[in-house]
Each structure stands twice: as structure tokens, then as C-alpha cells.
Swiss-Prot record:
One of its GO terms (biological process) is translation. Belongs to the bacterial ribosomal protein bL27 family. Residues 1-21 are annotated as: Disordered. InterPro entries: Ribosomal_bL27, Ribosomal_bL27_CS. This is Large ribosomal subunit protein bL27. It comes from Thermomicrobium roseum (strain ATCC 27502 / DSM 5159 / P-2). One of its GO terms (molecular function) is structural constituent of ribosome. It holds the Pfam family Ribosomal_L27. HAMAP family: Ribosomal_bL27 (MF_00539).
Length: 99
């Protein structure tokens, strides 16, 4: 007579891979055109000046420039790229000549 029940099976034990969402380039950073700025689900961050939005809501730079995060409302923000730094003096990008 068996004194232990059968082990049975479980329906757990699976998980999906992480999607690597989030902000990829930060405020004040210099970015070349085409750089991914934010990967997101839905529009937590809205595209601003010189920023495009992909089919999956990815925001990317349309021009070379400096990233700027701007508030829209309490829970929404806009990401823009400006050719010149906004609001503060930043060092020149690597490889540029200084006079």
C-alpha cells in the first residue's frame, strides 16, 4: 500500500523575457538623428519638436541635437530634440573643434 501520493504536475514555471522598456537617452544628452530616446507601451512620453514616434510608440530623434524633457501635465511629458542646448551650457560633443 502506497503511503505517498503521486507527485502530480504544475501549470506554473513560465515567464516572458524582459522587454527593455524605458528612457534610453536623458535630458541634456547630445544625440545623432535616428537615436532611440524612449521605448514605451502607450504614450507616457509624447513626441515633441524634432522627435518621431514609431508604430510601437518608440520615440526617436529626427535631427542631431540635445534631448529636452518638458512637462505637459501632471502625468504626461514631451520629449524634444533641439539643435542647441536649452537652458544651460553643455560641453561640445566629442570630436568637435573648439576655437
Amino acid at each position: 500500500m502506497a503511503h505517498k501520493k503521486g507527485g502530480g504536475s504544475t501549470r506554473n514555471g513560465r515567464d516572458s523575457r524582459a522587454k527593455r522598456l524605458g528612457v534610453k537617452r536623458y535630458d541634456g544628452q547630445f544625440v545623432p538623428a535616428g537615436s532611440v530616446l524612449v521605448r514605451q507601451r502607450g504614450t507616457v512620453f509624447r513626441p515633441g519638436r524634432n522627435v518621431g514616434m514609431g508604430r510601437d510608440y518608440t520615440l526617436f530623434a529626427l535631427i542631431d541635437g540635445y534631448v529636452k524633457f518638458e512637462p505637459i501635465s501632471r502625468d504626461k511629458r514631451r520629449v524634444s530634440v533641439y539643435p542647441e542646448p536649452v537652458g544651460r551650457t553643455l560641453p561640445a560633443p566629442a570630436g568637435s573643434a573648439t576655437a
